[in-house]
């Protein structure tokens, strides 16, 4: 009888531990890249992963691994596409702020005459007593439904965006990880 009680008690402890573990959207390996060859495809991907999911004035909440939840207000969110005389460019951007942080993400693609180029800029800056800052032009990796922004210098993923959702994961250069709620 004691064995059964002990086994039930152990199972209860394990199930509580599993319930209390929060899932992380932190990338654990490199995604399988999806080849996007036109500016229009890149722009559509940027828009559906970033600006379409946010309206100016709305509140978005993130959980930092060492803190309670943090609410951000969308300050700016927009996308633009321009095409003329064989050249085109697409741009999508998001600026969000909390009491402690300002986060700016920009994605852009441009090209013409058979050549395409895409790039990104991300800045995660503390606005009060926080000192961690992150600013770089990361590598963009497209997968089927996500965009991964990877710092080529460090190899770390700074941000992951998901189509129809927006930001699901961020990391600053102090190693703080943020997960969307």
Model-based region annotation:
Residues 27-181:
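Conserved functional acidic sites
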Residues 22-24:
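Bacterial signal peptide processing site
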């Amino acid at each position: 009888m004691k064995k059964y009680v002990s086994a039930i008690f152990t199972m209860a402890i394990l199930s509580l531990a599993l319930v209390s573990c929060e899932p992380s959207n932190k990338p654990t390996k490199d995604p399988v890249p999806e080849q996007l060859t036109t500016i229009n495809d890149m722009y559509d991907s940027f828009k559906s992963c970033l600006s379409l999911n946010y309206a100016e004035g709305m509140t978005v909440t993130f959980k930092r691994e060492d803190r309670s939840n943090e609410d951000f207000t969308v300050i700016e969110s927009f996308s633009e596409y321009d095409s003329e005389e064989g050249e085109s460019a697409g741009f999508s951007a998001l600026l969000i702020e909390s009491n402690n942080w300002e986060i700016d993400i920009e994605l852009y693609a441009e090209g013409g005459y058979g050549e395409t180029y895409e790039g990104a800029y991300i800045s995660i800056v503390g606005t009060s007593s926080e000192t961690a800052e992150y600013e770089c032009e990361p590598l963009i990796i497209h997968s089927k439904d996500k965009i991964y922004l990877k710092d080529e210098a460090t190899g770390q993923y700074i941000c992951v965006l998901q189509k129809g959702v927006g930001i699901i994961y961020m990391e600053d250069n102090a190693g703080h990880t943020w997960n969307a709620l």
